């Protein structure tokens, strides 16, 4: 999932003050593991990972040290009698699919001809999960599974299964409100047809808005055709430096700062509101997190020092201010300081600083993993 940050002072503070299992993450398509950046929450985090890859789930279970993180080896899907499933009957799985022409697919085919088996990393990056040993084909409707497991509240739902993402999203049509889900990350594709059942970005966006969510982050990845392959971005076949926009990751959340959903917000606990702020912070939207904290200060203040939380968000904004109050005073009294610059030296310095913070945050996360009991 694109968009998460390595360094997040708000999550570090929350980890110190939290009750266990106060944040519920559900990761559908968890091959590669639960993103380590969520683990900054410490004991606040409780997570369920779901994936059909038998060997990958066995690997994740064997290496998992946190008893609050569990894994289910299964295909997530939608009930056959669900209205969306009925509507999709007889329609192609992928309309206008460009994948067979992409250099990523051709690369893997060439490796096969050389009798070289794709690694797990290559399968994940090039969406070759079909070549893995998979769970029984029986579908698990995830909202039903969560109910049977005694999970009555979910804070963040991630869906990335390289195909049936939109179907799985529809299986949550009632559960989005019943589970009080605060944020959703889902892989979207920008190719496809104009069919309302096609899992294209425009259909996902329409569905999410109809259920009270707004788009807060969107990444797009490029894939080149085999007619003129571009260099791969990473050390495994996948996205390329050039090419057509292909898939991306969209992050939706409850826009409780807008005032449009005050009735929904009135039913939320302080923990749910704080979890929404945490979602914004980890997706590098400290401004949206600050909006939640300031609007619902009274609801959240019983869980921790809201001013300390705001100071952490100001630090994430990286303005050089010593505190949230100083940051706001600067904007009030010297707004011109917030204007951008085209000076290449200034831009280079900012880029280096950003890169250093990203590197340092990753080192901190890796160190925590090594020291975990």
Predicted features and spans:
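SAM cofactor-binding core of SAM-dependent methyltransferases
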Residues: 6-92, 96-102, 107-115, 120, ...
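Short Gly/charged-rich anion-binding patches and loops
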Residues: 55, 141, 203
């Amino acid at each position: 999932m694109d968009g998460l940050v390595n360094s997040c002072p708000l999550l570090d503070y929350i980890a110190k003050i939290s009750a266990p299992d106060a944040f519920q993450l559900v990761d559908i398509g968890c091959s590669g593991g639960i993103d380590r950046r969520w683990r900054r929450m410490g004991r606040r985090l409780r997570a369920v990972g779901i994936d059909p890859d038998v060997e990958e789930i066995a690997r994740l279970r064997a290496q998992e040290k946190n008893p609050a993180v569990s894994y289910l080896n299964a295909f997530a899907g939608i009930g056959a009698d669900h209205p969306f499933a009925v509507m999709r009957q007889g329609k192609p799985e992928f309309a206008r699919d460009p994948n067979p022409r992409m250099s990523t697919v051709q690369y893997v085919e060439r490796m096969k001809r050389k009798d070289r088996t794709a690694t797990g990393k290559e399968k994940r990056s090039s969406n070759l999960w079909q070549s893995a040993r998979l769970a029984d084909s029986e579908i698990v409707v995830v909202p039903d599974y969560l109910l049977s497991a005694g999970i009555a509240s979910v804070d963040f739902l991630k869906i990335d299964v390289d195909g049936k993402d939109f179907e799985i999203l529809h299986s949550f049509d009632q559960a989005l409100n019943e589970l009080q889900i605060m944020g959703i990350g889902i892989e979207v594709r920008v190719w496809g047809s104009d069919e309302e059942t096609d899992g294209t970005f425009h259909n996902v966006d329409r569905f999410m808005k109809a259920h009270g969510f707004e788009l807060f982050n969107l990444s797009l990845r490029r894939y080149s055709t085999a007619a003129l392959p571009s260099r791969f971005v990473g050390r495994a076949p996948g996205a390329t430096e050039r090419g057509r926009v292909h898939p991306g990751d969209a992050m939706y959340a409850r826009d409780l700062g807008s005032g449009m959903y005050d009735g929904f917000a009135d039913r939320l606990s302080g923990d749910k509101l704080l979890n929404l702020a945490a979602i914004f912070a980890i997706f590098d939207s400290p401004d949206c997190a600050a909006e939640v904290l300031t609007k619902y200060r009274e609801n959240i203040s019983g869980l921790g020092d809201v001013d300390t939380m705001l100071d952490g968000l100001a630090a994430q904004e990286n303005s050089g201010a010593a505190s949230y109050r100083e940051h706001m005073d600067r904007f009030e009294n010297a707004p011109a300081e917030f204007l951008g610059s085209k000076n290449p030296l200034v831009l280079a310095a900012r880029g280096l600083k950003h890169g250093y913070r990203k590197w340092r945050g990753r080192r901190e996360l890796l160190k925590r993993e090594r020291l975990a009991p």
